[in-house]
A protein has these predicted regions:
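Detector for repetitive beta-architecture
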Residues: 7, 42-44, 50, 57, ...
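Glycine-rich loop at the start of a catalytic domain that most often binds anionic cofactors/ligands
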Residues: 60
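Short coil/loop residues immediately preceding or within conserved phosphate-binding loops
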Residues: 5, 25, 119
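Boundary/junction segments of secreted and surface-exposed precursor proteins
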Residues: 2-12
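Right-handed parallel beta-helix/beta-spiral solenoid domain characteristic of secreted/periplasmic
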Residues: 63-130
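Extracellular/periplasmic catalytic domains that process cell-envelope and extracellular macromolecules
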Residues: 1-4, 38-39, 63-67
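Acidic Gly/Asp/Thr-rich repetitive segments characteristic of extracellular carbohydrate-active
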Residues: 12-48, 52-57
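Aromatic side chains
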Residues: 8-9, 28, 53-54, 75, ...
Length: 130
């Protein structure tokens, strides 16, 4: 039996959101393309080394399983320049990625905010095994 895990590639360097994102040569260009997907257990999201995702955020709303987590990582882009081997991708939110969050109850102490606006480059919303 073959697995149906998918690997999605995102490259600000040489991607395009009209691509399917399923190979380095057909990488997406933005994180917004990933945000529109329904990820399944075992799927991987790989960001191209050297990419700077300006004004973008990654919102994962799906869950993996203990046996097949959803993985987020980095890869060397098709351009393959030696420079990129040591450079990790950057998500530069720059004021984007703001959500209103209400946990419905106070958390473990009154100093923790349980409702209000939060900002993050990566939001794991009701997700586990990432």
């Amino acid at each position: 039996m073959t697995n149906s895990f998918k690997t999605y590639y995102v490259s600000q360097i040489d991607g395009n959101d009209t691509n399917d994102g399923l190979s380095k040569s057909s990488a997406f260009a933005t994180l917004f393309a990933i945000n529109r997907l329904t990820l399944k257990p075992g799927d991987r999201v790989l960001l191209a080394r050297g990419s700077v995702f300006e004004g973008q955020f990654l919102q994962i709303k799906d869950s993996g399983t203990k046996e097949s987590p959803i993985e987020i990582g980095a890869y060397l882009p098709e351009s393959g320049e030696k420079f990129y081997e040591e450079v990790l991708p950057v998500i530069a939110v720059n004021g984007q990625g703001i959500w209103y969050q209400d946990y419905g109850t106070e958390l473990d102490s009154p100093t923790h905010v349980y409702q209000g606006y939060v900002s993050s480059a990566v939001l794991l919303y009701d997700a586990e095994y990432i």
